[in-house]
């Protein structure tokens, strides 16, 4: 009997928010060949942006039902250095640097666990890929 290799994926916050609001990716997620994992930074972003009780419940339910990964010290340190390099290279404003720092944390965590990042935010993740290779899938 041949064993199938399981492919891991992390859905970026942008995918969760869009699917929560519109249901646009429900079928795509259900039929995906990936085994989805959660990471603490995505849960942080979802909870930080939750305004209504149903949004908070959604984020907490995700955290309870996904196998969660927490960022390591090495990822935090690498993320700081990488975000600074990107900010300098692209001449980003302070707010953009703050937003990008979460995407860098997501990318580096996915890389560390061998997962694919699935996002709607193509440009920022492709910019990150210029400095660190990781698997990326962009949904439209």
Please describe what each predicted stretch is.
Residues 3, 68-120:
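Active-site neighborhoods of divalent-metal-dependent phosphate/nucleic-acid chemistry enzymes
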Residues 22-23, 49, 82, 128-131:
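Residue-level signal for well-ordered alpha-helical positions
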Residues 1-8, 107, 111-140:
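Acidic, PIN/NYN-like endoribonuclease modules and their adjacent C-terminal/linker elements
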Residues 11-12, 38-39, 98-100, 121-122, ...:
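Histidine- and aromatic-rich ligand-binding microenvironments
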Residues 53-57, 86-87, 134-138:
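Short, hinge-like loop/turn segments at secondary-structure boundaries
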Residues 1-42, 47-66:
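Short, well-structured N-terminal submotif of metal-dependent ribonuclease cores
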Residues 15-16, 42, 75, 106, ...:
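Alpha-helix capping/helix-boundary segments
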